């Protein structure tokens, strides 16, 4: 629409009257605020964009990675260039309008004068300067922001504002003041409660160690003396027990101990009794309990009997020693030679000829005769019982005849 208006103005520069000139001036005045309005819109957009970016920076977390930050920088730079492109397009359109309107130099001169009188040309030049300044300033800002983002992971304190630097200087001065104040407080506390000097601490510990060693040595000496006394008392008790055992019974031993002045404990009494039993067993059997046995756990009389049995078992037999029972079993006669031979084989008797030809006493002869009669009667009864039970089973109950037969026998 702006280009068509300029063409109409350029087509008839001479025919216009002063009324038409006024009308054209009013149209130019109507055109110029459009451009100004358009420029103000782009400016407001850029300002809003800057505010948004500042808010985003404030609310951005420090824990983002480098890649995410680079991506955001690229997006922001692309968004910044978009309003600049729209401004360039508006500027090119205005240049074209001026070129088209250059045919009418007088009108252009009048317009310039009017605009200068109203302050439009000054505002346009100022707006252009501001645009150039804003572009250069934005570029510098983008560069400084990229540098700050690179430097952030190294030290966050560098990327902070100038007020922080001022606060640092203030904090340093405060720290100096605190350092100056601290030793004063410490000195006050020391003056209130004065501790012992450190030089005497080492001496005290050394003295304590020496005293502890001396105490340990004294305790060890006392323990050794007590042990020696106990050993001496035990030896005396053993000697007295041995003397009492050699002298006689337990009553005498206890009396001897009481007479000697030693305290009679139950252990000493038990030892005295066992010593008396050992002496008695030795006097009767001639066998003493060896020293490796506990006298309180071993009965000396039973031990002596066991030793006798062992000697009898492991001692060799003598030829002349034969007991009466052995002679009776050897001379036993069942009235039948076959039975006698079987019996001697079972009993392990070997000297058959000696038993037959040996001289027999009168008493032994009588016993042998009685044994023969007993064995004969037993054989006869066995035969009768066998015949009745095995061969005569069909003969009634078997009480009358069998009992009569037994009576006759």
Swiss-Prot record:
Source species of the chain: Xenopus tropicalis
Pfam families given in the database record: SMAP
Identification of the protein by name: Arginine/serine-rich coiled-coil protein 2
Membrane-spanning ranges: none
Family: Belongs to the RSRC2 family.
Record-linked InterPro entries: SMAP_dom
Biased composition (Basic and acidic residues): 1-31, 64-108
Record's signal peptide: none
Biased composition range(s): Basic residues: 34-50, 109-191
Source superkingdom: Eukaryota
Keywords noted in UniProt: Coiled coil
Region (Disordered): 1-204
Positions in coiled-coil regions: 204-244
């Amino acid at each position: 629409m702006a280009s068509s208006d300029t063409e109409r103005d350029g087509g008839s520069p001479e025919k216009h009257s002063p009324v038409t000139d006024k009308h054209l001036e009013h149209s130019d005045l109507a055109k110029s605020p459009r451009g100004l309005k358009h420029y103000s819109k782009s400016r407001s957009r850029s300002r809003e964009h800057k505010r948004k970016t500042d808010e985003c920076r404030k609310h951005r977390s420090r824990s983002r990675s480098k890649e995410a930050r680079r991506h955001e920088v690229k997006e922001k730079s692309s968004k910044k260039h978009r309003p600049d492109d729209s401004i360039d397009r508006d500027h090119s359109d205005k240049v074209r309008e001026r070129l088209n309107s250059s045919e009418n130099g007088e009108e252009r001169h009048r317009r310039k004068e009017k605009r200068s009188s109203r302050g439009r040309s000054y505002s346009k030049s100022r707006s252009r300067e501001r645009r150039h300044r804003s572009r250069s300033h934005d570029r510098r800002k983008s560069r400084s922001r990229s540098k700050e983002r690179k430097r952030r992971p190294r030290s966050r304190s560098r990327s902070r504002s100038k007020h922080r630097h001022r606060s640092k200087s203030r904090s340093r001065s405060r720290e100096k003041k605190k350092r100056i104040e601290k030793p004063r407080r410490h000195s006050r506390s020391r003056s209130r409660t004065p501790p012992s000097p450190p030089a005497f601490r080492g001496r005290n510990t050394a003295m304590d160690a020496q005293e502890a060693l001396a105490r340990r040595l004294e305790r060890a000496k006392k323990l050794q003396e007590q042990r020696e006394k106990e050993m001496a008392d035990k030896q005396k008790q053993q000697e007295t027990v041995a003397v009492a055992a050699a002298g006689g019974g337990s009553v005498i031993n206890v009396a001897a101990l009481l007479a000697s002045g030693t305290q009679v404990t139950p252990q000493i009494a038990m030892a005295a009794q066992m010593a008396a039993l050992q002496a008695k067993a030795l006097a009767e059997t001639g066998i003493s309990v060896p020293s490796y046995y506990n006298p309180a756990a071993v009965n000396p009389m039973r031990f002596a009997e066991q030793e006798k049995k062992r000697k009898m078992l492991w001692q060799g037999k003598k030829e002349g020693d034969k007991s009466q029972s052995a002679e009776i079993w050897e001379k036993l006669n069942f009235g039948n030679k076959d039975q006698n031979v079987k019996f001697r084989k079972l009993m392990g008797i070997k000297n058959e000829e000696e038993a037959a030809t040996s001289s027999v006493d009168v008493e032994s002869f009588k016993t042998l005769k009685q044994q023969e009669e007993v064995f004969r009667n037993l054989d006869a009864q066995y035969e009768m019982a066998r015949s009745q039970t095995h061969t005569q089973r069909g003969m009634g109950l078997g009480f009358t005849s069998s009992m009569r037969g037994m009576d006759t026998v």
